[in-house]
Amino acid sequence: MKKIDVKILDPRVGQQFPLPTYATSGSAGLDLRACLDDAVELAPGATTLVPTGLAIHIADPSLAAVMLPRSGLGHKHGIVLGNLVGLIDSDYQGQLMVSIWNRGQDSFTIEPGERIAQMVFVPVVQAEFNLVEAFDATERGEGGFGHSGRK
């Protein structure tokens, strides 16, 4: 199994705040926590950057990571990622910050140590571009939006 080097920058991680974990053996996402000194109140429509206390260097160009919102925060409170999905390239070497957006109607308080996002490692396939005049014909052709029907 491939291992990814995740450095802990904030000494509170593993002490005051739990180490990042997978909630179950079948979890794809690794929970990320708000590494804050004090609670942060986020007004409706507002965004803020929240540190995780972690730094990462994936190093393998065949891998990347994506940061995703936690479903409960989005559904129950309107708390999602400000950039919708965070992409972490294999050559990035800095701290993981989470852009949090309150799209809800009420203020929301982010507590120190609260699980705020999840990170999933994914394979990467880079495109190779070739100039062509046309594609080989297929049954579908250029049929786009709704072309294959609803049933």
From Swiss-Prot:
Q: Write down the superkingdom of origin.
A: Bacteria
Q: Does the keyword Lipoprotein apply?
A: no
One Gene Ontology molecular-function label? dUTP diphosphatase activity
Keyword Glycoprotein assigned to the entry: answer is: no
Pathway, per Swiss-Prot/TrEMBL?
Pyrimidine metabolism; dUMP biosynthesis; dUMP from dCTP (dUTP route): step 2/2
Q: Which UniProt keywords apply?
A: Hydrolase, Magnesium, Metal-binding, Nucleotide metabolism
Q: What is its EC number?
A: 3.6.1.23
- Which cofactors does this protein require? Mg(2+)
Its biological purpose: This enzyme is involved in nucleotide metabolism: it produces dUMP, the immediate precursor of thymidine nucleotides and it decreases the intracellular concentration of dUTP so that uracil cannot be incorporated into DNA.
Could you say which protein family the record assigns here? Belongs to the dUTPase family.
What is this protein identified as?
A: Deoxyuridine 5'-triphosphate nucleotidohydrolase
Q: Which organism is it from?
A: Salmonella typhimurium (strain LT2 / SGSC1412 / ATCC 700720)
Top-level taxonomy: Bacteria, Pseudomonadati, Pseudomonadota, Gammaproteobacteria, Enterobacterales
